[in-house]
Amino acid sequence: MLACVAVSAGSVDKETPCRCALPCHRSRYKCPEEASSPSHDCSCTDSGNWFLIDWPQVAAYTMIGQLKAQTAYEGVKTLAANGVEGDIVELGVWKGGVTMLLALAAARFRNESLPRRHLWAYDTFEGLPEPGIHDDAKARDIYRALANHENTTEVHKRKRMGLISADNKWNVGAIAEVMTNVGSVLNERRAVPTVHFVRGKVEETLLDPRNVPSRIALLRLDTDWYASTRAELAILWPRLAVGGLLIVDDYDNWGGARRATEEWMKDEHIPGPRGVV
């Protein structure tokens, strides 16, 4: 499950479809193909159908399921329709599948009255760091088994899923591989967003102002552990635009992410997740 918090979202304007290669709405949106191929004449499709076109391109590079993926994808469309300014930020990208999907959505659903969105992808790109004392026992046990080269049931399961590297690192997505994966979808699109890759533990990289966007429209947290999630919420939440979307992917999967989120909600006087998928 994931926790979604929408920040004082405004009303969605009605859409007026036109005929072009990507969805566009004459008063608010511009299709990247429109200027370069004015004679192009294929019927526009709603975002649900565009998701079904884009999802197969990225599914092999993410661990999340189709429902979670579509939630994020539709979020990008809603942000554009509502005129919410800001960048798209993902922390914990593994092999880049969700980053790829968000880039495709940002290219498909553009609001010409807004500055061009950038994408930010944060990860160690060397696998999950060691969980801390505020993370659940399961996470610590798996990490300890990997460090000791023990093939426990949980370790074996993750090896079968392709989540453990040959050198016993957990959830490794090398930065060169991720950049190649993301580039494979960006190269096919005009008007694609700029993608910033920030390498290192987020508790450290987020302390450098150069690594942090000034305004965020969509904030997706997927780093699993308590310390990273707590740092992300503390530093990035104040930059989330009114009407922006916060997604905590592992709210119901890992105790550390859930604890960090609930502590932050209490500190910020937020009553609780407003949508759980």
What label would you give each PLM region?
Residues 32, 40-66, 84-277:
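S-adenosylmethionine/decaboxylated-SAM
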Residues 1-8, 12-70, 76-84:
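Rossmann-like AdoMet
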